[in-house]
Amino acid sequence: MVVRATEIEGLMVIRMRQVEDERGTVREFYRESSWLSAGLPSLGPWLQVNLTETRRGAVRGLHAESMHKLVAIASGQAFGAYLDLRAGSPTRGNVEQLRLAPGTQVLVPQGVANGFQSLSAGGSQYLYCFDHEWVAGMAGVAISPLTAGIQWPLAIDADDRSQVSAKDQAAPPLTELPPN
């Protein structure tokens, strides 16, 4: 397991331990003792785990839930975007952009907006775990090609519901969020 810090405080990119043989690959998604040895926070117990299937070009997010989130691509390729929205954070306003593939996880701290765009022709499967149960009304930021300078790799039509959900598009734009 390899852990890399980012330009956003607490946002970590983790390369999972993998074992490959003739049958395929096993990826160790979470082992508490390995996480603690790597200096990562204890995250259990997970109270909700979701797996989404997302078509090529579609975007999910930007969501800024009030919980920690561990995300990974189970299949396909995706682009991940992260924006620190936390009041008082020394990295507030910082953006991290990553290519995501199986074997890579991202630990998203509470209050950091996160979103992803599927890049694979056959779509992407995105696994995410929460340390709290999701409830309606959690914070987010509207997707636009100009949101915080995020460079989405595929063109986005925010009015196309096959690309951006009505809920995600109804989130406030970044310019309407309260200042620090």
Model-derived regions, located:
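Non-catalytic, conserved peripheral segments adjacent to functional cores
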Residues: 1-100, 122-123, 130-138, 142-180
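Conserved metal-binding segment of the jelly-roll/cupin
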Residues: 99-121
